[in-house]
A protein has these predicted regions:
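Hydrophobic, membrane-interfacing alpha helices
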Residues: 1-264
Length: 264
């Protein structure tokens, strides 16, 4: 583990805080550049980014506290001390960004799905660095394990699943996959509508899917981790349904086409 990058006299540079700052910068820059290229007003883009960061910080911290309530307890001061009690939930950050986006869609008449696709590419560098920071500072561990990938974390006697490292690796694979398909998905025949939203829905669907097995190794009380599994599964199914509805395909048309081929 590497909780501290640099310590010189009264100055201490924490790994988690440093990677968090780098992630915020990369996210803001990528989103700003992509939305500017869409032709959106630059001052409105900056307002959107600032609101998204504030809401993302709030929701991600809130969800992380709920997920790890046995660690935080009823101590509001611990909830606010990011350095001594670090941790943010990736899905909370997504929620904050998309609440901000919804506000600008209503007020500024932005195209929701087209903007969401562009924003998605900016979120992943932040989320990856966030999970990597949790791993390096020793807070991103899961349940105890005897498997070969188990790691000893500071202050813990038993090997634990490197939960944050697994999350960071999964997010990197998803991000790489989205970059590879960005210029190709519109020519895929099975996605008939060619409508925007493909990238954002793919990202969310894969994240919910990966969160299901990760929930099994998360350190939480039984009712909490069962709730996480159920909620992620429901969210994944919802994304699949939404994906299908936006794809331009129809079960009714497919059935009629199959029926006509049999009668001819």
């Amino acid at each position: 583990m590497l909780p501290i990058i640099l310590s010189a006299g009264p100055v201490t540079l924490y790994t988690y805080g440093f990677l968090l700052a780098v992630g915020v910068f990369l996210e803001s820059f990528i989103i700003w550049r992509r939305l500017r290229d869409l032709g959106l007003k630059e001052e409105k883009v900056i307002d959107f980014i600032l609101l998204g960061l504030l809401l993302g910080l709030f929701f991600s911290r809130l969800i992380f506290i709920v997920q790890n309530f046995s660690y935080f307890g009823w101590h509001p001061l611990n909830w606010l001390l990011f350095v001594h009690y670090p941790g943010l939930a990736s899905l909370g950050w997504w929620l904050g960004i998309f609440v901000s986006l919804w506000r600008f869609v209503k007020v500024e008449k932005w195209d929701f799905w087209r903007t969401a696709d562009e924003i998605t590419f900016g979120l992943f560098p932040f989320l990856i660095l966030l999970q990597l920071g949790s791993f390096l500072d020793g807070s991103g561990f899961g349940r105890s394990t005897n498997m070969f990938w188990g790691i000893y974390f500071p202050g813990i006697l038993l090997k634990r699943h490197p939960l944050s490292l697994l999350s960071a690796s999964s997010l990197f694979v998803i991000w790489f996959f989205l970059i590879k398909i960005e210029r190709h998905w519109r020519v895929w025949e099975w996605y008939k509508s060619k409508e925007s939203g493909f990238i954002a829905l793919t990202a969310l669907g894969l994240i919910f899917l990966i969160n299901i097995p990760l929930a099994f190794i998360r350190e939480a009380k039984v009712y909490l981790y069962l709730a996480q599994i159920a909620l992620n599964f429901i969210a994944f199914i919802f994304i699949l349904i939404l994906f299908y509805l936006r794809s331009g395909r129809s079960l009714k048309k497919g059935y009629e086409k199959q029926k006509d081929s049999k009668t001819s």
